[in-house]
Regions:
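Conserved catalytic-loop aspartate of Hanks-type protein kinases
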Residues: 84
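Structural helix C-cap motif within protein kinase domains
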Residues: 97-100
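Catalytic-loop of the protein kinase fold
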Residues: 18, 22-35
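Conserved C-terminal C-lobe helix
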Residues: 128-138
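Activation segment signature within eukaryotic-like protein kinase domains
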Residues: 6-7
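Conserved activation segment of eukaryotic-like protein kinases, specifically the C-terminal portion
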Residues: 61-73
Length: 138
């Protein structure tokens, strides 16, 4: 339930940015602050250093982002604002099980796994996760 509330706020904030033609390009837990001092925590997205304005009909090609959270399209230098949605999916995966879906000992290994798009939700860390949350991840 907490993960759903957090993801809903992140999606709302990113939608706000996208409606104003701003793409973040480096969404990750380290760039999301949460106010825990109140009953209903609020998030704030920070570090817009790699953000950019965009046009709906144009693709971007500059490679920005953090390997664990980067969309495969960014690695191919051909992406749009939806790269932020990929990153939110990775953040959701981490909120649910505690670790990233694409792992590796080196940056190159992580990027290879992101490119392959292979991840697992069948191990014991996912036993207590609802089927609807698993469906959303897939």
């Amino acid at each position: 339930d907490d993960a759903a509330k957090i993801i809903k706020q992140i999606l709302s904030a990113v939608s706000y940015c996208h409606q104003r033609n701003i793409v973040h390009r480096d969404l990750k837990p380290e760039n999301i602050l949460m106010n825990k001092d109140i009953k209903d925590p609020k998030i704030t997205i920070i570090d817009f250093g790699t953000s950019s304005s965009f046009r709906k009909d144009e693709r971007m090609s500059q490679k920005f982002g953090t390997p664990y959270y980067i969309a495969p399209e960014v690695l191919q230098n051909n992406y749009d604002e939806k790269c932020d949605i990929w990153s939110i999916g990775v953040i959701m995966y981490i909120l649910l099980c505690g670790y990233p879906p694409f792992n590796g000992a080196t940056e190159e290994e992580i990027i290879a796994r992101v490119t392959e798009g292979t991840y697992c939700i069948d191990d014991e860390d996912w036993e207590d996760i609802s089927d609807s949350a698993k469906d959303l991840i897939q």
